[in-house]
Each structure stands twice: as C-alpha cells, then as structure tokens.
From Swiss-Prot:
Topology of the protein relative to the lipid bilayer: Lipid-anchor
Organism classification: Bacteria, Bacillati, Actinomycetota, Actinomycetes, Mycobacteriales
Localization terms from the record: Cell membrane
Name of the coding gene: lppA
Protein name: Putative lipoprotein LppA
Family statement: Belongs to the mycobacteriales LppA/LppB family.
CC per GO annotation: plasma membrane
Record lipid sites (S-diacylglycerol cysteine): C33
Keyword annotations: Cell membrane, Lipoprotein, Membrane, Palmitate, Signal
Organism: Mycobacterium tuberculosis (strain ATCC 25618 / H37Rv)
Keyword Signal among record annotations: yes
Length: 219
C-alpha cells in the first residue's frame, strides 16, 4: 500500500488536521489506498536525471535518521528554553493527527514521496506563552541551534502580544518558533532519501510503488 502523502508544513496547525482528515476520507473511498505522488515536480526530471540525483544524495544518509536528529535538536532547544525561562515547560505534541503529519514529513521539490522526503521533527508545545523578553530569549536559542545546520536567514511576520513568530532558514532547513494561542516549535529538514531507497543498488530507479485494486476481493 502506498504511504499517505506528506502534508505541507507551511499550513497552520488546524489546516494540517483538516488535510489529514480529508486524506483519511479519500483512503476509505478508494479502498484503502492513497495516491502518493508529486506530479508538479516529478515530471521535471527524466529517468536518468532522477537516478543521478538519487545517487548524489546517498551520502547524506536516510530520511529516518535525519528525522531522529531533528527531533533530538528540538528536544535540546526545548530543554534550553525551559532552563533559561523560569516556570517554562514543554512537551512533544500528543495530537495523533499532528504526530502522523510529523512522521510523514514534507514533500521534496524534485523527487516523489516514495523516494525522498523532508523530515519534520516532533512538534514541540511549550507550557506557557512567552512575554516579549522571554520570546527573545527563546528565539536566540533557536538561532544558535539552527546555525549548526547552516540555517541563518532570519525573518519574522509579527511581533505583538497576541502573535509572535521567529523563523530561520538555510541549507534546506527551517526552524520556526510561533506563538498565537500557545507557543510551538517546528523544525523541517532538507530532502533525504528514504532508507528503503538507500538499501537499493546505485544506478537505478526504485521500483514503482504497487497500486492495489480498488474493488474488494471475494473471500
């Protein structure tokens, strides 16, 4: 069965939940399978170009390992923030829909999701919102850890009592500290090959994922 398609991490939290719900509905309607492709990008490369791109990415390691590293970094940031700001706590988001979205990752630009994905760390939820000064402390910690990944381009859309955000990107990575009704930390990584693709010999395309029949099989 084809894995669920990753959800864009640029969507707000509630829109990601709606998108995941719609995927579940479509899965039921077509007999338990969801289409997992990215036609806008996968058509840009020939088969030989895909092979060359895949082989050039092999030394980066796997998507699964990269996701573990990012989640470890999210934990480091959250621990540092909690230690620096008295009374602050944190936990990984326990919403099953968000957890599923994080596990699925985000789409790459030139390879379909059955070949490569962008890892998403487990989402961090802080126990309390930040004051203006505390948000600066947290953002500085995010900045320091993001720089270790080569992410140094900073931006912010809003900085007021009701809404604050800090975003830093670079080298294919994005770290985002966001506060609206509650404060969260989200980290998205560069594009990495799935482990099952790394396990295949170089110089060839992975086999096409199977598409199961949509009609029920008699027992």
């Amino acid at each position: 069965m084809i894995a669920p398609q990753p959800i864009s991490r640029t969507l707000p939290r509630w829109q990601r939940i709606v998108a995941l719900t719609m995927i579940g509905i479509s899965t039921a309607l077509i007999g338990g399978c969801t289409m997992d492709h990215n036609p806008d990008t996968s058509r840009r490369l020939t088969g030989e170009q895909k092979i060359q791109l895949i082989d050039s990415m092999r030394n980066k390691g796997s998507y699964e390992a990269a996701r573990e590293r990012l989640t470890a970094t999210a934990r480091i940031i959250a621990d540092r923030v909690s230690a620096a700001i008295p009374g602050q706590t944190w936990k990984f988001d326990d919403d099953p829909n968000i957890q599923q979205s994080d596990r699925n990752g985000a789409l790459c630009d030139k390879l379909t999701a059955d070949i490569a994905r962008r890892p998403i760390a487990n989402s961090v939820m802080f126990g309390a919102t930040f004051s203006a000064e505390d948000f600066k402390i947290a953002a500085n910690i995010v900045r320091e850890e993001a720089a270790k990944y080569g992410a140094t381009t900073e931006s912010s859309l809003f900085n007021e009592s009701a809404k604050r955000d800090y975003d830093v990107q670079g080298n294919g990575y994005e770290f985002r500290l966001l506060q609206i009704k509650f404060a969260t930390l989200n980290i998205t990584g560069d594009c990495f090959l799935l482990q099952k693709v790394l396990d295949l010999p170089a110089g060839q395309l992975p086999p096409e994922p199977p598409i199961w029949p949509t009609t029920s099989t008699p027992h």
